[in-house]
A protein has these predicted regions:
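Outer-membrane beta-barrel domain signature, strongest for Gram-negative TonB-dependent receptors
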Residues: 1-77
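Alpha-helical hydrophobic/aromatic positions enriched in membrane-embedded helices and signal peptides
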Residues: 6, 53, 60, 90-92, ...
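A generic structural signal for solvent-exposed, polar alpha-helical segments
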Residues: 15-17, 169, 177
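Beta-sheet entry/capping signal
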Residues: 21, 178-179
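Transmembrane beta-strand segments that form the barrel wall of outer-membrane beta-barrel proteins
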Residues: 26, 125-127, 179
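Detector for methionine-enriched segments
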Residues: 34-36, 46, 50, 113-116, ...
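Signature of Gram-negative outer-membrane beta-barrel scaffolds
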Residues: 65-174
Length: 179
């Protein structure tokens, strides 16, 4: 089944600075099956995450609220286990677990420009790292295997870095509507 276990701690550090710390454990379990018993097959995938998040809100003045923080997630994936009945002609298969770390830092300002116009702007930098143990395969455009490289537990297989600028505007048409 699916489960989530959050822990959260909010703290007012002073009259202008607010902290929100979170730890979230999650388990997503997906299963798909066809047939029953000896004639059936089932495919199961699992995603388990450990997520630590720290957010700060700093109230600069009546018109500006600075928000900043970071997030670290450890992913454990079981991408697909096959449980085949004896009469299917298929063999049971357990896929190798995959592991990754997802990290991010951000800073943004919520600014009231006029009584009806607000702006949110900032920058988020995200990084994903796939780690071993595992094997990295490289294929050509026709799907033929070119190379394979083995990685030990905890060794980096691939890294991805992304800069994510943020900008949004909100115009209050009236008390009930905004653009």
């Amino acid at each position: 089944g699916n489960a989530t276990g959050p822990l959260r701690w909010n703290h007012i550090l002073n009259e202008r600075l607010f902290s929100n710390t979170s730890l979230v454990l999650s388990n997503y379990d997906y299963e798909f099956g066809l047939g029953m018993g000896e004639d059936g097959i089932a495919v199961q995938s699992v995603i388990r995450d450990v997520n630590v998040k720290q957010d700060f809100s700093y109230y600069l003045n009546n018109d500006n609220t600075l928000k900043l923080g970071f997030n670290v997630i450890h992913h454990t994936l079981e991408p697909g286990n096959l449980d085949a009945g004896n009469n299917t002609g298929l063999s049971n298969r357990e896929a190798d677990q995959k592991y990754g770390f997802e990290n991010a830092v951000y800073v943004q300002n919520q600014q009231q420009l006029t009584p009806k116009l607000n702006a949110n702007y900032g920058l988020r930098v995200s990084h994903f790292s796939q780690v071993g143990s595992g094997t990295k395969y490289t294929f050509d455009n026709d799907g033929n295997l070119l190379t394979s490289e083995d990685f030990e537990a905890g060794e980096r297989i691939a890294d991805y870095l992304q800069w994510e600028p943020r900008l949004s505007l909100n115009y209050a048409v009236n008390e009930m509507s905004a653009l």
